[in-house]
Curated annotation (Swiss-Prot):
It comes from the Eukaryota. Mediates the endocytosis of plasma glycoproteins to which the terminal sialic acid residue on their complex carbohydrate moieties has been removed. The receptor recognizes terminal galactose and N-acetylgalactosamine units. After ligand binding to the receptor, the resulting complex is internalized and transported to a sorting organelle, where receptor and ligand are disassociated. The receptor then returns to the cell membrane surface. A motif (Endocytosis signal) lies at residues 5-8. Calcium is required for ligand binding. One of its GO terms (biological process) is endocytosis. Ca(2+) 3 binds at residues 240, 242, 253, 265-266. Pfam families: Lectin_C (PF00059), Lectin_N (PF03954). Glycans are attached at residues 79, 147. This is Asialoglycoprotein receptor 1. Keywords: Calcium, Coiled coil, Disulfide bond, Endocytosis, Glycoprotein, Lectin, Lipoprotein, Membrane, Metal-binding, Palmitate, Phosphoprotein, Receptor, Signal-anchor, Transmembrane, Transmembrane helix.
């Protein structure tokens, strides 16, 4: 009986093993369940904690570096601002000093110009006085040579014609310079009032461009001594004056001159032409005024 029971139990075990082999191995547990079980969960938590700690340390280090750089930038900006303010203040001070120096120099320059103007006026008076003295002396010499007979006379190197005295240049000047030269001689640029005077002047100037005392720089044509132009003598070339602008020297033609044939033409006042000065005979021989 016992042996039979043992055989049945052995057979039952074999059938049980055979049944398990037919069913296969037991199903495996999910990955998350295995990770969250026991020691594995502890290790995972520890790893995440370490990773978080590393991230916090890195961020803290970077934040510290950024704050350090920000402090450096603030300090640099503060120094730059202070330096700029100091430079601006220095430039402002220098500008004030330069302005004061410029005002001082302007005052000195104005004073020097005033002194030069006064000296120039005084020099012109002395020159005119010298010219008058020279004319008076020449007339006195002429009177002595004429056995004491008193008569009006022209200065030395001046030519007498019809109660006027004429001086003919041998060099060239611009019209304004020639006009000033005649004024210093207590005379004026020649004013032609008749055909006889035209022929006289033309005879002495020859075929050379020569300035006369006629211009239209301020509007209408006029003579420098106030002689009426509209009703007076004229000897213009055909189609003159034309106030031509094509010469390339700027402006028109505002000053009159004798041409090579004696007739008149208007031209640029800056051209260096010869000129003729004229003064009245009685004026040339009068006694100089006392200063």
């Amino acid at each position: 009986m016992t042996k039979e029971c043992q055989d049945l139990q052995h057979l039952d075990n074999e059938e049980s093993d055979h049944h398990q082999l037919r069913k296969g191995p037991p199903p495996s547990q999910p990955l998350l369940q295995r990770l969250c079980s026991g020691p594995r969960l502890l290790l995972l938590s520890l790893g995440l904690s370490l990773l978080l700690l590393v991230v916090v340390c890195v961020i803290g280090s970077q934040n510290s570096q950024l704050q350090k750089e920000l402090r450096g930038l603030r300090e640099t900006f503060s120094n730059f601002t202070a330096s700029t303010e100091a430079q601006v203040k220095g430039l402002s001070t220098q500008g004030g000093n330069v302005g004061r120096k410029m005002k001082s120099l302007e005052s000195q320059l104005e004073k020097q110009q005033k002194d030069l103007s006064e000296d120039h006026s005084s020099l012109l008076l002395h020159v005119k006085q010298f010219v008058s003295d020279l004319r008076s002396l020449s007339c006195q010499m002429a009177a002595l040579q004429g056995n004491g007979s008193e008569r009006a006379c022209c200065p030395v190197n001046w030519v007498e014609h019809e109660r006027s005295c004429y001086w003919f240049s041998r060099s060239g000047k611009a019209w304004a310079d020639a006009d000033n030269y005649c004024r210093l001689e207590d005379a004026h640029l020649v004013v032609v009032t008749s055909w006889e005077e035209q022929k006289f002047v033309q005879h002495h100037t020859g075929p050379v461009n020569t300035w006369m005392g006629l211009h239209d720089q301020n509007g209408p044509w006029k003579w420098v001594d106030g002689t009426d132009y509209e009703t007076g003598f004229k000897n213009w070339r055909p189609e003159q004056p034309d106030d031509w602008y094509g010469h390339g020297l700027g402006g028109g033609e505002d000053c009159a001159h004798f041409t090579d044939d004696g007739r008149w033409n208007d031209d640029v006042c800056q051209r260096p032409y010869r000129w003729v000065c004229e003064t009245e005979l009685d004026k040339a021989s009068q006694e100089p005024p006392l200063l």
